[in-house]
């Protein structure tokens, strides 16, 4: 095992406020994505400062849709020059549920649809139960009927992000204050929902 390669900084020197043509519900994102998977972020590969994106190694832990390679390049919006508020650059060990599109047609690089709007962070309860956290609230705002969904208050949120890296935990916490809590989805319920969507 080698020392993980980390991004030079988790935050850019500037903040970018992105405007999106649309927001996605879980079901819309699932249908539109080339691939949907729970992934673990590995080494930082580098950044493209012209397009303000950063590249990371990522490994698929669980695939729900599409034919992702076991290891692929995850492309995140943001770089050392600019990041979106509340959305630090990933780091080695970050676990995510992502709704992905092929970035450049190579089948090796993928980016989340509309970037952070379709990125859910993986968090765990005390018993080791796995949940997916919508820290920006944009997916859950479109999706009031998805099973297994709960809204956490700040104390519950602090508990469930205690093992998350401190930069991300702090970003999630400040985001939750802006949105009056964060929604989480239970893994088992979302997996059942995905298998129903896949049959449609």
For every predicted segment, state its role.
Residues 13-32:
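Short boundary/loop segments of OB/S1/cold-shock single-stranded nucleic-acid-binding domains
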Residues 26, 33, 83-89:
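Short, surface-exposed secondary-structure edge patches
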Residues 1-7, 84-200:
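Netrin-like (NTR/C345C) domain of secreted extracellular proteins
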Residues 50-78:
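OB-fold (S1/OB) nucleic-acid-binding surfaces
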Residues 40-42:
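Conserved positions in beta-strands of structured domains
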Residues 44-48, 63-66, 79-82, 103-107, ...:
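Solvent-exposed loop/turn segments at secondary-structure junctions
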Residues 26-35, 46-50:
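Short, solvent-exposed beta-strand/turn "edge" segments of beta-rich domains on protein surfaces
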